[in-house]
């Protein structure tokens, strides 16, 4: 239908975020259809969250294509976004020393010891995309003034040689909603990461919370014949 025509234009980037979509009258004239058919096309786009109508202002594109990342090797968020042609940024960065929850302490074999906790909100093309909550052992000597620096954490502690990751779809907590400025009913892709150094010692535990409407992961596997 006509709705699919406009949907493809939006998904292919012919119509970008902020662009005005043809009015019902314009659609009628261009495609020689009834007012009801033209209205239905716009309604379909609106129901799928691709456009938004402003009273007396017209209909504008709100859809942003998902960032698709292939899970094949270890790289930082900055490297991921740069490779995809996006501009990475940091909305907020806070580092503290605190006693983590019991599950995190058990993961690192700690009792009541403190760890570094780093909370970051990262952006892609100035759009809020992911909220990171990371824990690191104090033995890594991460500077507490790192939030004033531009270097990545891996530049300080060294890149991991192995990571274990687990993905799940969750409903966001209040903390995640505030960080990403999303509603409680917006799905989030949760990514749990445990990183190891070359001595197979755990050096990082991170929970990543990605906006489900803007991010997806592709996993490719192959079999040797």
PLM regions with names:
Residues 37:
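Residues in the helix-turn-helix
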Residues 14-19, 47-56, 62:
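Beta-hairpin "wing" of winged helix-turn-helix
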Residues 1-6:
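Short, small-residue-biased leader/transition segments that mark boundaries at the very start
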Residues 60-73:
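Short, cationic-aromatic polyanion-contact patches
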Residues 75, 87-225:
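C-terminal all-alpha effector/ligand-binding and dimerization domain
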Residues 42-43:
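Short, hydrophobic-biased segments on the C-terminal half of alpha helices
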Residues 20-31:
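A short alpha-helical element within helix-turn-helix/winged-helix DNA-binding domains
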């Amino acid at each position: 239908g006509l709705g699919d025509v406009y949907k493809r234009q939006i998904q292919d980037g012919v119509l970008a975020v902020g662009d005005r979509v043809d009015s019902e009258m314009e659609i009628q004239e261009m495609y020689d259809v009834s007012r009801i058919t033209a209205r239905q096309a716009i309604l379909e786009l609106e129901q799928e969250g691709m456009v938004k109508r402003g009273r007396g202002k017209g209909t504008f594109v709100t859809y942003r294509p998902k960032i698709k990342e292939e899970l094949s090797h270890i790289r930082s968020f900055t490297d991921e976004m740069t490779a995809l042609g996006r501009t990475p940024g940091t909305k907020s960065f806070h580092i503290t020393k605190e006693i983590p929850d019991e599950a995190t302490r058990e993961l690192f074999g700690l009792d009541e010891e403190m760890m570094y906790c780093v909370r970051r909100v990262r952006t892609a093309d100035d759009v809020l995309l992911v909220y990171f909550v990371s824990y690191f052992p104090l033995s890594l000597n991460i500077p507490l003034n790192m939030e004033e620096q531009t270097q990545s954490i891996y530049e300080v502690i060294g890149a991991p040689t192995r990571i274990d990751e687990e993905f799940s779809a969750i409903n966001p907590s209040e903390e995640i909603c505030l960080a990403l400025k999303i509603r409680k009913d917006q799905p989030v892709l949760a990514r749990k990461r445990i990183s190891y150094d070359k001595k197979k010692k755990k050096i990082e535990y991170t929970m990543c919370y990605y906006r489900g409407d803007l991010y997806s992961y592709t996993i490719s596997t192959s079999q040797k014949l």
